[in-house]
Amino acid sequence: MASRWWVVPAGRLRRLVYPQADRMRAEIAELRKANAKLNTRVAELSADLDAVKAEFEKLHTWRTQLHADMDAADRDRIELVRPYTMTSMDKLTSLTLAVRYIVQSGIDGDFMECGVWKGGSVHLMARVLGDAGVTDRDIYLFDTFAGMTEPTARDVDSAGVSAKERMQKSSKKAKIWAISPREEVEAGLQTLDYPQQRFRLVEGRVEDTIPGQAPERIALLRLDTDWYESTRHELEHLWQRVTPGGVVIIDDYGSFKGSREATDEFFQRLDPPPFLQRAGNARVVVKR
């Protein structure tokens, strides 16, 4: 019997041989999308885990640095301010002792910080004052509440990297920008028992707000604006207002060259220059 052959169009043959090919390809594409999403989620969870590990290590470091000569109240206060500060344990300990010294010595004047971020150091001041039964001191918070001002070429970190370069390469969410809106700072202050009317927030560049809006007499002055120009301006206008026996803290002395140069230039003009006590990489001065 003779063989019979049929000519079938290629498209029809494909449909005959693989009737479900299109559906299978669609399912494979969906599986690939799902797999990509899964990989993304795994990466996110891995990053979250790394963040948790980093926070745990930070907490462990904080706890191991809680000095044996600190009492339980000191430890509790420092733990409470942790969410509001980037300040090290040594600096917070020094600040605690400075506030206590001012109270015990009866040093007259208000408390003032330039560059507050979320207000953690002010929280600590208020808590130490309140626990000592002192609620009549005004506490001034000077900040742009919009992040750091523009650094200059003199502002270089301890690794030799310019602050401007670091900021340009960093997201504005990075800590070097130190952005904390006024509303966020005010909300933090409202968690404290210290009289709210005693907190005086001054918004703007310190070059614009000081000396005009600064208190006349200062018992404790904490400078944390990082850069040469701001630190120089603060010292030149505020040192004369610090009460004899009062305390000045320069937070970024060891972190940024500009802050250190401004501090050294100013104090070396005094006769005699004061002793700068080290607290972490900050410097603490008691005015004679």
Task: Explain the meaning of each model-derived region.
Residues M1-D74, M86:
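Boundary detector for helix-to-coil junctions that initiate low-complexity/charged tails
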Residues S94-G106:
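Conserved alpha-helix/loop element of class I SAM-dependent methyltransferases that forms part
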Residues A68-M89, S105-R288:
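S-adenosylmethionine/decaboxylated-SAM
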